[in-house]
Amino acid sequence: MHELVWSRLKEALEDLSQEEIHWRSLPQANAIDVIVRHLRIEAQWHLDSLQIGVAMPTIAVAAPQEAIDAVPLDFEENLKRLEESYTRFVDILRATTLATLRQRTAAAYGEMSRQTYRLGYHQAAHMAMHCGQIRMIRNLYRKMRGEPPGFVPDNPTYPK
């Protein structure tokens, strides 16, 4: 699941122009660079929760605003750091026992840890949601310029 989500995200981020990276469909909407920054921050939090057993910010503890503010809006650097954190997370997850995963999930999510192994899949689900958001932004960007969408389902249940 993690490998599939990562490959889909990488595919969704291929061949981006600088304009497309920063484009917003509305002034209050997220741009792709903002989403990648968000994913980078959260990937580090997931890694820290799995690797050293710390509580998950925004869920079990308050978000460290000073640390968040220190992460610049630099698409290339954030994508690089996201990949490093995500890859490390998956490597550690592969080597983690179910008992340790259960313990780290409880530490990460506190009272929200009703799902015993949530730490093992939460990041992939979160990233998949934002991957869909990025694809939608890219399709809207192209549509606004009279170009065909780049992400069209190849599935007979969708009309042509």
Regions found by a protein language model. Name each.
Residues 67-107, 115-128:
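Acidic/histidine-rich alpha-helical segments that form the ligand environment
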Residues 16-19, 94:
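Short, solvent-exposed, charged loop/turn and helix-capping segments
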Residues 2-10, 18-65, 107-160:
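Short, contiguous alpha-helical
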